Swiss-Prot record:
Record InterPro entries: LMBD1_LysCbl_Transport, LMBR1-like_membr_prot
Family: Belongs to the LIMR family. LMBRD1 subfamily.
Record keywords: Cobalamin, Cobalt, Glycoprotein, Lysosome, Membrane, Transmembrane, Transmembrane helix, Transport
Topology class, membrane: Multi-pass membrane protein
Location(s) in or outside the cell: Lysosome membrane
UniProt protein name: Probable lysosomal cobalamin transporter
The keyword S-adenosyl-L-methionine is assigned to this record: no
Residues bearing glycans: 228
Origin species: Neosartorya fischeri (strain ATCC 1020 / DSM 3700 / CBS 544.65 / FGSC A1164 / JCM 1740 / NRRL 181 / WB 181) (Aspergillus fischerianus)
Transmembrane segments: 8-28, 40-60, 95-115, 144-164, 188-208, 314-334, 374-394, 416-436, 506-526
UniProt-listed Pfam families: LMBR1 (PF04791)
Top-rank taxon: Eukaryota
A GO cellular component annotation in the UniProt record: vacuolar membrane
Length: 563
């Protein structure tokens, strides 16, 4: 393979990885609370997110490398692209993919849990007294992590001893027969990958469509910061009413609350607590109003007003892109449901993919690398951004109970680790969705074509230089010797198709999960565009209480360290 071309492809991937590390670092820095930062937790979060996104972003490199072996204009393999060279390319990509997938699984199932328990085991008092050493802390965290290691070992053993899939009578797999695994080790790895991908897809179909549907509304509708004036008035009114009611109750007892009835005493206690909350809220709002009057905020507000048309354009563009991806996913899932040759028996694999707008766009742009890489990266970042917005909006929940809330500058290390674990699993679901649902034809063969013409001899390739109409795009169902000798599927599609074929239950669950994805996106999109924004007063009160605590801690620190 020409060295300059392969260097360009891998250099583009290196740039993307650098951008991924920056994106992950910014995300963690923005959302993690500054009061309780942990360098190890931050490293694990950044590394995990970057590693998962690097796995997804390897697809355009995969497609570019296998597609470079053929001439899309002639439908022939290039002179240097012998079968030995093609095998070297696919083997190196397979090693990289398996290494990344294994690393992803370890990070999700072992690395992040260990970081969680490592942080939980930290005792500041014991550490300062010398009673807690790093070795003791490491051993305590490892003991709790052993349960997760046991889960990984159990999954590998289940995959190792699970029955091998075979071609069933009445379901001729044809092209897909070669995807059935006979190696026990590869069978175990495929099961582990299918399991974590299915778990990730369960999170993906809830959080990602929620965030994607909310994104356009965040750009199109105005921010509710203007509600501060209204909130100041309503808070002052509530405070006046509260104090007037307290005066009435205190007037009944002459200032001695012991003379009040139990009902009035409970009401007075409630009013006192409510008064403290309202005072904190009033101080917080006044502080924010003072910040809004500073010149940087004033300049920023004026700049936002000037750029308002571009913000609307961005929101409308996000709406169109989201709608295009929704249509592409809908077309593929219906195509799989109707045209799969063996339906749920083989995980709804397709013999030939019908037209898909996103896949078509990527195939056309792949003829001028790295144009397809840029478009693909923007789509992946959009889905990841939507996943983050979904996690922030919904929070970390067990069933309907919210365990942690993800907020800018207010997320604890424990919540940050759980959010990272969720995002890594979601990214595995995103990886399957992009390859198998969003752009299946691009992800499988890219722009590869073959010459559907009988060769003049067994050693020569078919020549379509005078028969351009016989140059056809590669597909799984291309029943032609020329296609078998010319077309090379991407390694990513091969690995994920093996998951669906060897474990059809995973393939069926992943297909039906995308119907849920489409439905949730549609419902939340309509609701977000129709429903007006509301100010969360409960969250405002929590911010006020936290600001008061920080102010007290700061004043205590100043009084304890006189200059």
């Amino acid at each position: 393979m020409p060295l300059p071309w392969i260097s360009l492809i891998w250099f583009a991937y290196l740039i993307v990885i650098t951008v991924l590390i920056v994106v992950a670092s910014v995300f963690i820095h923005v959302y993690q609370t500054p009061r309780d930062r942990s360098s190890f937790v931050t490293f694990m979060c950044v590394f995990s997110i970057a590693a998962l996104l690097a796995t997804v972003m390897l697809l355009p490199v995969d497609v570019a490398l296998v597609s470079s072996t053929t001439s899309s204009a002639l439908g022939q393999r290039k002179e240097w692209a012998t079968q030995e060279e093609v095998d070297k390319i696919t083997y190196s990509l397979t090693v990289i993919y398996y290494s990344l997938y294994f690393l992803d699984a370890l990070l999700c199932l072992v690395g992040i849990p260990f970081a969680y328990f490592w942080h939980e085991e930290y005792d500041e008092v014991a550490f300062e007294a010398g009673d807690q050493t790093p070795c003791k802390r490491f051993w305590a965290a490892t003991k709790y992590t052993l349960a997760f290691i046991a889960v990984v070992i159990a999954l590998v053993l289940v995959g190792f001893f699970a029955p091998m899939s075979e071609s069933q009578p009445g379901h001729d797999l044809g092209y897909w027969r070669g995807f059935l695994i006979e190696n026990r080790g590869e069978h175990a790895f495929t099961f582990l990958l299918g399991f974590v991908t299915t778990i990730g897809s369960c999170l993906y179909v809830f959080y990602t469509p929620s965030g994607l549907a909310l994104l356009p509304a965040l750009f199109l509708r105005r921010s509710y910061s203007f509600a501060n004036q209204t909130l100041v008035g309503s808070t002052a009114m509530q405070l006046d009413f509260n104090r007037e009611r307290q005066r009435q109750l205190e007037g009944r007892c002459g200032g001695n609350s012991a003379l009040l009835s139990p009902k009035d005493r409970r009401e007075l206690d409630t009013l006192v607590r409510e008064e403290r909350t309202l005072i904190r809220r009033q101080r917080l709002i006044e502080g924010r109003q003072e910040e809004d009057q500073s010149w940087p905020v004033t300049v920023y507000s004026k700049l936002k007003t000037i750029l308002r048309p571009f913000r609307l354009l961005g929101g409308f563009s996000l709406f169109l892109v989201g709608l295009s991806t929704w249509i592409s996913l809908l077309m593929t899932v219906i195509d799989k449901l109707i045209n799969s040759p063996c339906k749920h028996h083989c995980g709804y694999v397709l013999s030939r993919t019908n037209f898909n707008p996103i896949s078509w766009l990527l195939i056309q742009s792949s003829r001028a690398f790295p144009t397809d890489y840029i478009i693909f990266a923007l789509i992946v970042f959009l889905f990841f951004w939507g996943s983050v917005v979904g996690v922030v909006a919904v929070g970390i929940r067990f069933l309907w109970i919210r365990i942690f809330q993800i907020r800018k500058g207010h997320t604890s290390p424990q919540a940050m680790l759980l959010a990272t674990a969720m995002l890594t699993l979601i990214t595995l679901g995103l990886n399957y969705s992009v390859v198998m649902m969003l752009a299946p034809r691009y992800a499988t063969f890219g722009p590869q074509t073959f010459c559907d013409l009988a060769p003049t001899s067994s050693e020569e390739q078919p020549d379509c230089s005078n028969h351009w109409h016989l140059v056809k795009p590669c597909s799984e169902k291309a029943d032609s010797t020329a296609a078998d000798n010319t077309c090379t599927p991407s390694v990513a599609s091969t690995i994920l198709n093996r998951v669906a074929l060897n474990f059809p239950l995973f393939g069926a669950l992943l297909l039906w999960a995308h119907f849920l994805f489409l439905g949730i996106y549609l419902v939340i999109l309509v609701a977000s565009l129709v429903r007006s924004p509301r100010l969360d007063e409960r969250q405002l009160d929590e911010d006020a209480e936290e600001a008061e605590e920080e102010s007290l801690l700061a004043s205590t620190g100043r009084s304890g360290n006189p200059t």
